[in-house]
Amino acid sequence: MSLPLGVPRRAFSYDDALEDTAPMTPPPADLCANVLWKQPVIPERKYQELAKIEEGDANMNAPVITPSSSTESVNKVPVVKAKATHIIMNSLITKQTQESIQRFEQQAGLRDAGYTPHKGLTAEETKYHRVAEAVHKLKMQSGETTKDDKQTSSAQSTPSSTPHSSPKHKNRGWFSQGSSASITAPDFVAMEAGGDRLPSERWSFFGPKAIQKSTNDPGGFTIQSYKGAQKPSPMELMRAQATRMTEDPVTFKPPKMDIPVTEGRKQSSHSHNIKPRDLNVLTPTGF
């Protein structure tokens, strides 16, 4: 390996330096960044002109100018190549994606048979323009099915005589489909008449869901979107458990807890002996 210019090779024995108490010799004074920068280390067979200049023992300025211009000319080519390959790869990936989407469309039956392309577009371009349309169709189909399911379930859970008492599930939006159709004339008059209501309540025919006061929390507001089988509140659950326990304390056996219960319970006789440490295994995870 050839040493860079400005760094002379010096025979240095570390064993002798260990035995010798004198300090190690400092590097030469001419070893600095300027020397290495003026004559850079260039691999062999890279630039033939530089090799000729070095062999011909030319002046110091020539090596400085030549590598910069040559490196610029060399560096330009790979950058352009990389950009070109990047663009080509992007277009290829886009084309493959579009083709796979079209294949899926054909399999799912989302494509219209009688589609006529725009006059200014070729048939090849219209294939790519129709991808967003097909995705929109797919979303619409899935949205309609969920809407129908929710309507049937709400109609089953709340049997009613009038069609408007069962709340319909609609997407949020200002002018959503069927929002104006669901408002009857007396409802609209009642909304207008109630002047002391909130503006969101008064103009609730723009949005599908009206804000009403909740029954459990008198201070807060809840969105009443579904009035089917409502979940019982925790207070109601506790009351139901207490009534069940007072009715038949023998059948109701809650897991053993540290909280003392005032009601007396009969200790059912077990054939097997359970130590108190084993009750941790037997208690359900909800407690």
UniProtKB/Swiss-Prot annotation:
<feature type="region of interest" description="Disordered">
    <location>
        <begin position="139"/>
        <end position="179"/>
    </location>
</feature>
<dbReference type="GO" id="GO:0016491">
    <property type="term" value="F:oxidoreductase activity"/>
</dbReference>
<comment type="similarity">
    <text>Belongs to the P33MONOX family.</text>
</comment>
<feature type="short sequence motif" description="Flavin-containing monooxygenase motif">
    <location>
        <begin position="50"/>
        <end position="60"/>
    </location>
</feature>
<comment type="function">
    <text>Potential NADPH-dependent oxidoreductase. May be involved in the regulation of neuronal survival, differentiation and axonal outgrowth.</text>
</comment>
<feature type="compositionally biased region" description="Low complexity">
    <location>
        <begin position="152"/>
        <end position="165"/>
    </location>
</feature>
<keyword id="KW-0963">Cytoplasm</keyword>
<dbReference type="InterPro" id="IPR026759">
    <property type="entry name" value="P33MONOX"/>
</dbReference>
<protein>
    <recommendedName>
        <fullName>Putative monooxygenase p33MONOX</fullName>
        <ecNumber>1.-.-.-</ecNumber>
    </recommendedName>
</protein>
<keyword id="KW-0521">NADP</keyword>
<keyword id="KW-0560">Oxidoreductase</keyword>
<dbReference type="Pfam" id="PF15302">
    <property type="entry name" value="P33MONOX"/>
</dbReference>
<feature type="region of interest" description="Disordered">
    <location>
        <begin position="245"/>
        <end position="287"/>
    </location>
</feature>
<dbReference type="GO" id="GO:0005737">
    <property type="term" value="C:cytoplasm"/>
</dbReference>
